[in-house]
């Protein structure tokens, strides 16, 4: 065996180990001092010359190269420093120059208490072989610096750094728990280059920090690259890493920590091979950017699950304006089922028997709004005396029609009193604006309904007789396209709302006249006035009563036997509160069958308006009478009001017949009994 080559290789490795620990300036000074043979002492670094116990270099060489079979020769264990040189044989001649350099290096691993993360103290045994030098004297407690890690430029005394690096020591203790692993490496002699001191320091860290808690997976972004073991990366490639325990396999961040420490890329591998050690803060940044496989899988899963829902939300929010070409909208296609012939027949049969307005048997058909208005206007013109629209009032005068003049007096919002020049008689003119939005109580359809009712009941006593009707443009402004319907009646007196000084006898006369008129119209045409206010009752000088304004009435058309009515579900009829008039509207709607059908004939609605009339007459007569004494007419009027009161409770009598009033005919049949 060539012992010279082995000794030279060990000495060369030991020299590389020492040069890596010492700083460049201190190393140069040490080399200069060793070449001069002077025992240079560096007080700041605590480097002392170690004197040899042997006399000559030849004896050292001979003792170093002693055969391995001799009892005094022992194998130097890997990872232990040299404490006693007496057990080695002869050394080579080339090691004499290196001996002087090693004698100047104090192998000291004593660390300050605030710098525990960089250095460690290892107490060595005297019975173990520590160095390839053969003639070094026996020293007590010789120490070796952790030559694998560079000495920091300034001492680290921050306690947070100590707590940050302690988990790394625990992890290293997991990998290398006992010193037997290192002995196996030395016995196999397969390692090309093993740094014993660094491995020993890691082993010492394991013994001192074995009681610390394992929380390094929570602070993996704070790990220092400087504490990663380079000796592990430089170890034998055939070495099999020990598997982690089952408890650590359950932690998802163990894999990320292992990959960040042992799975370095090409860039970090080049730095390690070149002897460059990355600073702590730079390595921390690199480890901070490395994510574990569990975190990456969780993020990708979260992104996949939320991607489709976000796209659907965008489609709903943005609508059809911005997402016409969206791929999701292209796939969202709805296919409607196509019914067979049997299903079609069933649907048609149900629609024919349906009572809805859109049923197949209904006469209601879809039509354009303009066409609908033109159709209503043509029907109005057919009921007028002039079958076309006049240009202006001058044309009406030329045709001999009644017109409004300067002597006309406005009685109400729509009624005027005028005089004819030839007849010297007064007339009542009703002015209706067709298609105007200002008056919600009128429309083309309502005007048509009123014209039909007037033409139907014309000649009936107590109802205003229509004399003339025609349509003229408004001409209030240049762009005005509204039409005005003029209705002329014979003068029948003034509205009851404007009358004053009415006594109880006159009040009773007005009440019974209105009841008789409604009874005739009710019996003949099934007519319900449905809007008999004081303005729609005219009183002449002789006390005769005339009913006007039939736009809200309901009647039966004799020609086609169909009911004609006006819907009273508009909010205009129910917007008032606190007055008896609007309470009557509510009571009328409650009397109609549910669902509400305004075409149903309900004669009790006329009784409701007679109750409204008796209550109003009772108040008006009290104001006119000065004396406080009650008379007979007043008692009768009070009794009528009580009988027509819809809130009256029917008394249960045995010997007296209960008065049941459901129509105006029933009320008139009780007239003789009430007036007695």
Curated annotation (Swiss-Prot):
A motif (D box) lies at residues 150-158. ATP binds at residues 389-397, 430. GO terms for cellular component: cytoplasm; nucleus. Disulfide bonds: none annotated. It catalyses: L-seryl-[protein] + ATP = O-phospho-L-seryl-[protein] + ADP + H(+); L-threonyl-[protein] + ATP = O-phospho-L-threonyl-[protein] + ADP + H(+). SMART domains: DUF3635 (SM01331). Pfam families: Haspin_kinase. Residues 53-93, 228-312 are annotated as: Disordered. The KEN and D (destructive) boxes are required for the cell cycle-controlled ALK2 degradation by the anaphase promoting complex (APC) pathway. The protein kinase domain is predicted to be catalytically inactive. However, weak kinase activity was experimentally demonstrated. This is Serine/threonine-protein kinase Haspin homolog ALK2. The lineage of its organism: Eukaryota, Fungi, Dikarya, Ascomycota, Saccharomycotina.
């Amino acid at each position: 065996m060539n012992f010279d080559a082995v000794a030279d290789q060990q000495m060369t490795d030991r020299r590389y180990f020492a040069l890596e620990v010492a700083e460049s300036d201190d190393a140069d000074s040490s080399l200069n001092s060793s070449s001069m043979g002077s025992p240079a002492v560096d007080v700041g670094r605590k480097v002392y010359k170690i004197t040899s116990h042997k006399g000559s270099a030849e004896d050292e060489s001979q003792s170093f190269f002693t055969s391995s079979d001799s009892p005094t020769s022992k194998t130097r264990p890997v990872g232990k420093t040299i404490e006693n040189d007496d057990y080695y044989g002869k050394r080579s001649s080339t090691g004499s120059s290196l001996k002087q350099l090693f004698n100047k290096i104090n192998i000291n691993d004593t660390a300050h208490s605030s710098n525990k993360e960089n250095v460690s103290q290892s107490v060595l045994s005297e019975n173990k072989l520590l160095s390839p030098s053969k003639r070094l004297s026996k020293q007590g407690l010789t120490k070796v610096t952790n030559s694998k890690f560079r000495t920091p430029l300034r001492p680290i005394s921050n306690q947070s750094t100590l707590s940050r690096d302690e988990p790394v020591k625990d992890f290293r203790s997991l990998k290398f728990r006992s010193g037997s692993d290192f002995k196996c490496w030395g016995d196999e002699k397969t390692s090309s280059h093993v740094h014993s001191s660094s491995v020993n320091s890691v082993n010492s860290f394991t013994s001192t920090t074995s009681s610390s808690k394992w929380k390094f997976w929570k602070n993996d972004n704070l790990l220092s690259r400087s504490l990663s073991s380079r000796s592990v990366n430089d170890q034998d490639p055939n070495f099999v890493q020990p598997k982690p325990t089952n408890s650590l396999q359950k932690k998802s961040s163990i894999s990320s920590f292992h990959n960040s420490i042992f799975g370095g890329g090409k860039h970090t591998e080049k730095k390690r091979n070149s002897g460059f050690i990355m600073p702590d803060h730079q390595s921390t940044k690199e480890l901070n950017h490395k994510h574990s496989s569990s975190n990456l899988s969780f993020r990708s899963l979260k992104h996949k699950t939320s991607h489709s829902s976000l796209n659907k939300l965008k489609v709903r929010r943005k609508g059809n304006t911005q997402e016409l070409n969206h791929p999701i909208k292209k796939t969202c296609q709805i296919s409607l089922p196509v019914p067979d012939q049997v299903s079609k027949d069933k649907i048609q049969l149900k629609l024919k028997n349906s009572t809805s307005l859109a049923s197949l048997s209904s006469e209601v058909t879809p039509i354009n709004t303009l066409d609908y208005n033109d159709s209503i206007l043509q029907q109005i013109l057919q009921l007028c005396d002039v079958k076309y629209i006049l240009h202006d009032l001058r044309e009406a005068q030329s045709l001999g029609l009644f017109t409004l003049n300067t002597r006309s007096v406005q009685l109400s919002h729509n009624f005027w009193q005028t005089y004819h020049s030839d007849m010297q008689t007064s007339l009542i003119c009703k002015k209706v604006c067709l298609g105007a939005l200002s008056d919600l109580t009128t429309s083309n359809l309502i005007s048509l309904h009123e014209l039909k009712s007037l033409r139907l009941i014309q000649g009936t006593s107590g109802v205003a007789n229509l004399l003339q009707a025609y349509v003229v443009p408004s001409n209030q402004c240049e762009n005005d396209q509204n039409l005005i319907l003029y209705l002329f009646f014979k003068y029948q007196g003034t509205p009851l709302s404007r009358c004053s000084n009415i006594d109880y006898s006159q009040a009773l006369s007005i009440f019974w006249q209105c009841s008789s008129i409604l009874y005739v119209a009710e019996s003949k045409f099934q007519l319900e006035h449905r809007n008999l206010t004081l303005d729609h009752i005219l009183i002449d000088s002789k006390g005769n009563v005339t009913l006007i304004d039939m736009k809200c009435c309901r009647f039966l058309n004799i020609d086609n036997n169909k009911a004609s009515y006006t819907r009273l579900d508009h909010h205009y009829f129910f917007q008032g509160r606190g007055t008896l008039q609007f309470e009557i509207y509510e009571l009328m709607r409650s009397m109609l069958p549910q669902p509400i059908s305004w075409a149903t004939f309900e004669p009790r609605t006329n009784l409701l308006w007679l109750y409204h009339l008796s209550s109003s007459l009772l108040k008006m007569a009290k104001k006119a009478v000065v004396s406080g004494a009650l008379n007979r007419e007043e008692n009768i009027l009070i009794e009528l009001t009580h009988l027509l009161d819809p809130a009256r409770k029917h008394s249960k009598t045995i010997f007296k017949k209960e008065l049941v009033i459901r129509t105006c005919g029933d009320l008139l049949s009780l007239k003789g009994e009430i007036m007695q």
